[in-house]
Amino acid sequence: MNEQYSALRSNVSMLGKVLGETIKDALGEHILERVETIRKLSKSSRAGNDANRQELLTTLQNLSNDELLPVARAFSQFLNLANTAEQYHSISPKGEAASNPEVIARTLRKLKNQPELSEDTIKKAVESLSLELVLTAHPTEITRRTLIHKMVEVNACLKQLDNKDIADYEHNQLMRRLRQLIAQSWHTDEIRKLRPSPVDEAKWGFAVVENSLWQGVPNYLRELNEQLEENLGYKLPVEFVPVRFTSWMGGDRDGNPNVTADITRHVLLLSRWKATDLFLKDIQVLVSELSMVEATPELLALVGEEGAAEPYRYLMKNLRSRLMATQAWLEARLKGEELPKPEGLLTQNEELWEPLYACYQSLQACGMGIIANGDLLDTLRRVKCFGVPLVRIDIRQESTRHTEALGELTRYLGIGDYESWSEADKQAFLIRELNSKRPLLPRNWQPSAETREVLDTCQVIAEAPQGSIAAYVISMAKTPSDVLAVHLLLKEAGIGFAMPVAPLFETLDDLNNANDVMTQLLNIDWYRGLIQGKQMVMIGYSDSAKDAGVMAASWAQYQAQDALIKTCEKAGIELTLFHGRGGSIGRGGAPAHAALLSQPPGSLKGGLRVTEQGEMIRFKYGLPEITVSSLSLYTGAILEANLLPPPEPKESWRRIMDELSVISCDLYRGYVRENKDFVPYFRSATPEQELGKLPLGSRPAKRRPTGGVESLRAIPWIFAWTQNRLMLPAWLGAGTALQKVVEDGKQSELEAMCRDWPFFSTRLGMLEMVFAKADLWLAEYYDQRLVDKTLWPLGKELRNLQEEDIKVVLAIANDSHLMADLPWIAESIQLRNIYTDPLNVLQAELLHRSRQAEKEGQEPDPRVEQALMVTIAGIAAGMRNTG
């Protein structure tokens, strides 16, 4: 195992050395010496040397304003390079890939060894695989796109340097290229100057498709096919592509006034334009490759006399002309020109698929399967995965916006105020209107700007080509009328098909009521007729954890899913659970495999639909090889969860979870909501107020500009606590509840739950991961530097709680130290701490200076502000999950 890390360590130290040379060239020897001194002090402080820890604090406190930025940037850039080395390590033959035999092969062998599973059953499970990844632009992808491109190239250099047979001159060339890339990064400003617009965010998503997924998805399918052939003697059908990508960028308007109907329309056009651009490159390759003459009578009939000489090329050139005409029309539309639709405009995937598939069948029939299964097969699979829209989008809006729109309408019509009606009256009105043949919206009505926006969005959905919008998600859904209201608004816009509408249940109360709401909906005949046996429900992870703490939230999520699965099964409805997880633990983030196997039995029958957020998109899909590895992990987990579902928890375990949930929620809310010192403590001990200055995402950090913790979005709430290393939202309440149950004499039962129930063991594993990343001496330093002395006792109390929590978690898990069963992650955290610690100490110092200046009525020093932004980005890179 250590050999495995030595490759990682040597890459990290080599990149560090090059960064050091870059700093020396740019700023001179003295700055490099300063950085080196700090690094050595940090390393020895981590090893337990208290004198050096004190010296580290003093050194960083005494930096002049001119030294702040270079030091902050040095450690921040180092962490970006370490992340790049680690990303490469996860796919390099000397690293993780070496000790990680193919995950799909492993899963298939495991399934084949189960006497109760026939090969036919496994095959059917493969055929019903469905994985939809929903890319969201959370304001947590801190790293700028230009730097991401440079890091991708650094990765490519590391890969080539790993080649044993490389000639000296090639080695020198690669090292020179690495130096150039690292110098370019050093001389690039790592902090965006302007907030990205929703269109910028969408373009970031398209860049991920182009740079990674476009190649990664066909590679993943080749890998899957190879493993299935080897283990089951089964070939994937050409049209079988179990993975789809959807995006919230440009569609998610919940709390983001910058996402308007016009923006959504623009992003839909842009997405189609990008698809034509990428498919044109593919077709260009096929025009040059498919020069064959021999073809089936069917293909020759299709091309006629004109194309008989080179039938495949003839078809490809025709398709190329259609793509070019489509692209030109989309380009004009994006510029705001209104043009008639050209002959042959591509709007549906079948129009792309048919000519390509005709070529494929003909090549196979004429004994040219080797050619058919080359680039042509990859393009066919891209048509199935990306198609004409490239990525579909979800629309998301808050339930009250629909209620307010209908209220305004009913008041105008003089039939009362929809907003004040009872739930029964709302439902009666909605069902009546949904069944009515006449339109509800009056022609000359002039609604308010807010209502007009809701109606315009429905109009955009109705006009978009079918298949380009995946679902309409209703956040803060609480009642059946919330769902029916959206169906009515869509009907009024003239939508010609049943759009999937997914309620999102996200607070503790809403999760607890989710099953009742869905049961009522499924009892409405009109609704049953509309959905045709399919229902999507979204489970919110971040808001429930912010509302009730992580233990109560995760149990409420489990129970809501469990009840919904059983209700839909009984009603004969195929349920797709849509998981709104984040990258960090407080937002439901867990290693994919463990997280999926810890869900209730049957939760993946309708496939997996999950959000992939901000910075996690880059960690999981930043390179084609990593895409293959991430998709394979998901595939293995879905197959395993469906064929070897986890056991139903015992009744006594459920009772213990109920108890843990109540105790932990009370403790969590006791601090967060009821302790009068809590909000002032939070505001001063973390960079929460300063985070608002970072031009991260296009949406505001708060739903309402004033207000306490409840008005903060879940992401800044977690982001702030991650910065000061207390990681509070991801553990508060959980350990205390466990301790109480242990004191009641149930430790052996908790140990059994940890051993035999994946849901519970995953919860504990996630707590261990958080505790491994948290750091009490740093959290204490923030208090000393930034918090009013009267609030120190609260900080001490919270840190003591965490210490107690760590002990109880280790006792139940029977571990001697944190992360004992995941040494690779422990190693990775230790490697980073040496570089993250100075950034934390420096951040506390910068916050101190910035707030002092504000108190004294001075203008903030731009050097301090800039260095502060860099520490925020650097710590986010060091923690590997932001919010």
Curated annotation (Swiss-Prot):
GO molecular function: magnesium ion binding; phosphoenolpyruvate carboxylase activity
Key word Lyase present: yes
GO-annotated cellular components: cytosol
UniProt-annotated catalytic positions: 138, 546
Domain of life: Bacteria
Keywords: Allosteric enzyme, Carbon dioxide fixation, Lyase, Magnesium
Catalyzed chemical reaction(s): oxaloacetate + phosphate = phosphoenolpyruvate + hydrogencarbonate
Keyword Lyase: yes
EC number, UniProt record: 4.1.1.31
Record comment: activity regulation: The enzyme has distinct binding sites for each of the allosteric effectors such as acetyl-CoA, fructose 1,6-bisphosphate, guanosine 3'-diphosphate 5'-diphosphate, long chain fatty acids, and L-aspartate.
Top-tier EC class: lyase
Signal peptide start-end: none
Cofactor: Mg(2+)
Any one GO biological process: tricarboxylic acid cycle
InterPro entries: PEP_COase, PEP_COase_bac/pln-type, PEP_COase_Lys_AS, PEPCASE_His_AS, Pyrv/PenolPyrv_kinase-like_dom
NCBIfam families: PRK00009.1
Family affiliation: Belongs to the PEPCase type 1 family.
Subunit-level organization: Homotetramer.
Function: Forms oxaloacetate, a four-carbon dicarboxylic acid source for the tricarboxylic acid cycle.
UniProt protein name: Phosphoenolpyruvate carboxylase
Organism field: Escherichia coli O157:H7
Protein's gene: ppc
